[in-house]
Amino acid sequence: MVTVEEVRKAQRAEGPATILAIGTVTPANCVNQSTYPDYYFRITNSEHKTELKERFQRMCDKSMITKRYMHLTEEILKENPSFCEYMAPSLDARQDIAVVEVPKLGKEAAQSAIKEWGQPKSKITHVVFCTTSGVDMPGADYQLTKLLGLRPSVKRLMMYQQGCFAGGTVLRLAKDLAENNKGARVLIVCSEITVVTFRGPSETHLDSLVGQALFGDGAAAVIVGADPTPAEKPLFQLVSAAQNLAPDSCGAIDGHLREVGLTFHLLKDVPSVVSNNIEKCLFEAFNPLGISDWNSVFWIAHPGGPAILDQVEDKLGLKPEKLRATRHVLSEYGNMSSACVLFILDEMRKASSNAGLGTTGEGLEWGVLFGFGPGLTIETVVLHSVPIKPGPH
């Protein structure tokens, strides 16, 4: 007779969950941040609000963003004038776009990750799909499974309305799934489009305007599994994962799904809340490893905005190069909510390889990935890099 303990042991993987492939994609429509205020105030019929436009121009100039990608083209916005008002009922039209385009963009990212992984998609055992862009039943996880032609027995998990911390959440969940199910291969997809949040300017709600200056569209996919086979190419190991609510931060970041779409609210002191709580999260994550020098690890932080990065850098005494990959993704894509940290992982491993560094983590062994979002919620993932094998010359 087999015991429960023996069954459990047989079910578990031997080694830690490992990232085996990463794929990223954006919509084709690219918007230049320097000219975006002119476009935004024209398309929303708000050019008469000259003072507000000047304010928005300053927000865009200070955003450290060069360009963003958006599914919403001028043509789509002209077909849906309600999107361009500040508070016009428009949820049906927004949903009609989101329920189709979110899984479609996610599929492109997933195909890219599967191609890099190099294994048959029939080996995917679990799907975790994450989006803050629209809700539906059956969800985007179901649509993705159909679009990719995955097995009907694939185990799906759908995460809606988590916000900007969720890139850390999906890695935490994938870690648990991979390590507790021997042979599991988990496909994570974060797909975000601003169709639910885009709206015209308001003189009384400047936090909404901040969102219009920062958010962009993108999808990222990651394949996670433990005990890689010789045919698989490990990129990062997921060593530990934690989630914390910052004390006294209620209302710091809120989003509410209404007839007008997803409304976005934030307090001015979000950068302070993050920077005041980050050291405690770092200490709890790295104390077991005997690490207390935050410059000795590689960094992947959700780039909520430049002020958050500046305050974190200042509070922890980080060298400017620590947030290079993070700032690069902010500059090239804007804030893509949950997808951002996965884009940064991709950027880091590619830049590390191109620079001839010894590991996927900028030549360093240990690293941290942070997600920040509504709550205020902080996700902390400890990563272990993988040695880069020199390619053929």
UniProtKB/Swiss-Prot annotation:
The keyword Transferase applies. SUPFAM superfamilies: Thiolase-like (SSF53901). The active site is at C164. It catalyses: (E)-4-coumaroyl-CoA + 3 malonyl-CoA + 3 H(+) = 2',4,4',6'-tetrahydroxychalcone + 3 CO2 + 4 CoA. Transmembrane segments: none annotated. InterPro entries: Chalcone/stilbene_synt_C, Chalcone/stilbene_synt_N, Chalcone/stilbene_synthase_AS, Polyketide_synthase_type-III, Thiolase-like. One of its GO terms (molecular function) is naringenin-chalcone synthase activity. Keywords: Acyltransferase, Flavonoid biosynthesis, Transferase. GO terms for biological process: flavonoid biosynthetic process; polyketide biosynthetic process. Its EC number is 2.3.1.74. Pathway: Secondary metabolite biosynthesis; flavonoid biosynthesis. It comes from the Eukaryota. Belongs to the thiolase-like superfamily. Chalcone/stilbene synthases family. The primary product of this enzyme is 4,2',4',6'-tetrahydroxychalcone (also termed naringenin-chalcone or chalcone) which can under specific conditions spontaneously isomerize into naringenin. PANTHER family: CHALCONE SYNTHASE 1, HYDROXYMETHYLGLUTARYL-COA SYNTHASE. This is Chalcone synthase LF4. It comes from Ipomoea batatas (Sweet potato). The gene is CHS-LF4.
